[in-house]
Amino acid sequence: SAITILYSIFGIIYCALLASKFKVSLLFAVLQVSFYIVQSVLYKNWGEVILNSAIVLPIILASIISWYTGADKKKEQVTKNQLKNYEWILLAVIFVVVAISFYFILDALDTQNAVIACISCAFTAAAHYLLLRKSQYMFHVFIGLNIVLFILWLLPIIQGDGFGIESLPMLITLVVYSISNIRGIVNWSKEKKASLASVT
């Protein structure tokens, strides 16, 4: 469908810019998430609709402000944050609370594959918290999210529910996301080493 194609196009552009032009990529993330919400409505993945509308889109918009205001205007770099111990505890609590609460919400909405969907919601909340905090570990959590989402969108094909082959662009985009996140890990590691070298 046109929605799936547009989602994939904006998603691939987002991925292409993710590692090297992260702040610019967030602008395409807004478009990508918007089309993803529409796509999720068509597939009746209500967990994705609720979470992306109420949490992910606002977090990305807040992240755009955070990343642009935190940028070094000369180096075009952003100060990365090291999460404190209490934040990791908070992140774990967020993951568990979102997973459990969304399971009951999705079950009440008679959502297919509710268990996978609620795990996806938990990964989404955790990944975007790390995005907002400008943590390098967001890439690792986003890879986990991509794997869960791949399973979530693959299941309708396996189960023979509705859209079938129309899910393929979605699956391809998720693979591209994972590759891009791996690039992000490598890129940020290089930046960290360069930063440490300049200090010493």
Regions found by a protein language model. Give the residues of each.
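Small-residue-rich segments of transmembrane alpha-helices in multi-pass membrane proteins
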Residues: 34-43, 87-96, 144-156
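N-terminal topogenic module of multi-pass integral membrane proteins
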Residues: 1-46
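Structural signature of hydrophobic alpha-helical transmembrane segments
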Residues: 1-7, 48-57, 110-121
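Alpha-helical transmembrane segments of multi-pass integral membrane proteins
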Residues: 51-63, 82-106, 120-123, 127
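Alpha-helical transmembrane segments in multipass membrane proteins, preferentially the mid-helix core
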Residues: 97-111, 118-139, 151-154
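Hydrophobic, ordered structural segments
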Residues: 31-70, 76
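C-terminal transmembrane-bundle signature of multipass membrane proteins
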Residues: 131-199
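Membrane-helix interface "capping/anchor" motifs
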Residues: 16-27, 129-141
